[in-house]
């Protein structure tokens, strides 16, 4: 395989086109530059630092205390599939398939 020319790179949809080897298209993946990620991280930190205070939640006229009222273990039990109290007894039935004679 030949390396792409260092000068002007031909791009399609913002990335270099795939290379054909033995009739199969092979995509060459190159690592991205880290400059854009650093800028995004700085912007994310600014938004995270200015979060509004959590509103108080009232349940039946009483202030909810969050995890103290509803522990995570209780929430897990509520979302688990209920088990059957009686096991299903499947009676073995022979299935007869009627077919025409030869």
Curated annotation (Swiss-Prot):
The modification Phosphoserine is found at residues 3, 49, 51, 91. Disulfide bonds: none annotated. The modification N6-acetyllysine is found at residue 29. Phosphorylated. Phosphorylation by MTOR inhibits the suppressive activity of DAP toward autophagy. It comes from the Eukaryota. The modification N-acetylserine is found at residue 2. Residues 1-102 are annotated as: Disordered. Keywords: Acetylation, Apoptosis, Autophagy, Phosphoprotein, Translation regulation. Residues 92-102 have a biased composition (Polar residues). InterPro entries: DAP1/DAPL1. Belongs to the DAP-DAPL1 family. Ribosome-binding protein involved in ribosome hibernation, a process during which ribosomes are stabilized in an inactive state and preserved from proteasomal degradation. Acts via its association with eiF5a (EIF5A and EIF5A2) at the polypeptide exit tunnel of the ribosome, preventing mRNA translation. Involved in ribosome hibernation in the mature oocyte by preventing mRNA translation, leading to ribosome inactivation. Ribosomes, which are produced in large quantities during oogenesis, are stored and translationally repressed in the oocyte and early embryo. Associates with ribosomes; inhibiting translation. Interacts with eiF5a (EIF5A and EIF5A2); inhibiting translation. This is Death-associated protein 1. It comes from Rattus norvegicus (Rat).
């Amino acid at each position: 395989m030949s390396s792409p020319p260092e000068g002007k790179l031909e791009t399609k949809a913002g990335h270099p086109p795939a290379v054909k080897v033995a009739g199969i298209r092979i995509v060459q993946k190159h690592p991205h530059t880290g400059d854009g990620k650093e800028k995004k991280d700085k912007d994310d930190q600014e938004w995270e630092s200015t979060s509004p205070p959590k509103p108080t939640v009232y349940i039946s006229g009483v202030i909810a205390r969050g995890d103290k009222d509803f522990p995570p273990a209780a929430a897990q039990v509520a979302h688990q599939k209920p088990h059957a109290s009686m096991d299903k007894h499947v009676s073995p039935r022979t299935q007869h398939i009627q077919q025409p004679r030869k």
